[in-house]
């Protein structure tokens, strides 16, 4: 099942791999940026990969922050889908890539990890030197008072508020990298959304929605890490979204080496010191 979402990679060339590893070996302080491609081997699809990415398989339309905040029907649509997807998304396990990066923390040459993912798999693998740039789908936050609870706790509250819903809709659709699934229109009708137990406000998964600004404290912290590093390794991201690409661009402006492992083109290919179109695990297990 996990391999279903791993795109077809270029044939592994030992000489290219050795050169790549040798070049990275010259970097004293390495900053790593990870994207959805690092989690495809855990059975979570990415967005843009050819043939197997979410956008290649279905007409996925993400919910925008402004729509979520102003429309109860939009919130019903979001939470009914998220409710049915959670058992599968919440049980996703780290793969060899997450564990490899967790072990890198023991090295003085590893500086920090910035992940664009919201699946929490880096933390599940034991990583501590990590910034979840877009937040975490493993917790839910009040949009008014900042009350936070675990996603599983909120799942229990959703289940209590919607008896029989998951039994009636037993076949979840395609899973998205943010824990969303696709359901027929109208499925959400009547779905009840528990409010904040502290202030009665709207609850929302603690992730950055489309149309919502990334937390600037996180952004500034990540810029500091880029300034401090001697080079960047980008893993499993096309860098199509500005929130991650800006750090690569900043490093490039400072003439820092950039290394990329991604199956398919990225927005920063022309900036790369070297790029490999290989499966991430095939590279990391040799490093």
From Swiss-Prot:
Ubiquitously expressed with high expression in the pharynx, body wall muscles and gonad. Zn(2+) binds at residues 142, 145, 196, 199. Its main location: mitochondrion. It catalyses: N(6)-acetyl-L-lysyl-[protein] + NAD(+) + H2O = 2''-O-acetyl-ADP-D-ribose + nicotinamide + L-lysyl-[protein]. GO terms for molecular function: histone deacetylase activity, NAD-dependent; NAD+ binding; zinc ion binding. GO terms for cellular component: mitochondrial matrix; mitochondrion. The active site is at residue 134. CDD domains: SIRT4. NAD(+) binds at residues 35-55, 116-119, 236-238, 262-264, 280. Keywords: Metal-binding, Mitochondrion, NAD, Transferase, Zinc. It is found in: Mitochondrion matrix; Mitochondrion. Its EC number is 2.3.1.286. Its cofactor is Zn(2+). The keyword GTP-binding does not apply. Belongs to the sirtuin family. Class II subfamily. This protein may be expected to contain an N-terminal transit peptide but none has been predicted. This is NAD-dependent protein deacylase sir-2.2. It comes from Caenorhabditis elegans.
């Amino acid at each position: 099942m996990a391999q279903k979402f791993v795109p077809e990679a270029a044939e592994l060339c030992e000489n290219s791999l050795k050169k790549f590893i040798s070049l990275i070996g010259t970097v004293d302080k390495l900053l790593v940026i990870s994207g959805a491609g690092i989690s495809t081997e855990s059975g979570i699809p990415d967005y843009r990969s050819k043939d197997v990415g979410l956008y290649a398989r279905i007409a996925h339309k993400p919910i925008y922050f402004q729509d979520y905040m102003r429309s109860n029907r939009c919130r019903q649509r979001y939470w009914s889908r998220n409710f049915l997807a959670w058992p599968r998304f919440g049980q996703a396990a780290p793969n060899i890539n997450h564990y490899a990066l967790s072990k890198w923390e023991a090295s003085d040459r590893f500086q920090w990890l910035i992940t664009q993912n919201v699946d929490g798999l880096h933390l599940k693998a034991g990583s501590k030197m990590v910034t979840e740039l877009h937040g975490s789908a493993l917790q839910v936050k009040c949009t008014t008072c900042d009350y936070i609870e675990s996603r599983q706790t909120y799942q229990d509250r959703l289940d209590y508020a919607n008896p029989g819903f998951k039994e009636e809709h037993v076949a979840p659709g395609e899973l998205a990298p943010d824990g969303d699934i696709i359901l027929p229109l109208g499925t959400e009708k009547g779905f009840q959304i528990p409010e904040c137990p502290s202030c009665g406000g709207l609850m929302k998964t603690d992730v950055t929605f489309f149309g919502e600004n990334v937390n600037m404290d996180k952004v500034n912290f990540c810029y500091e890490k880029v300034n401090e590093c001697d080079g960047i390794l980008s893993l499993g991201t096309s860098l199509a979204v500005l929130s991650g690409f800006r750090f690569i661009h900043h490093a490039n402006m400072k003439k820092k080496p950039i290394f990329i492992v991604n199956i398919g083109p990225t927005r920063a290919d022309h900036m790369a010191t070297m790029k490999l179109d290989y499966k991430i695990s095939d590279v990391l297990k040799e490093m």
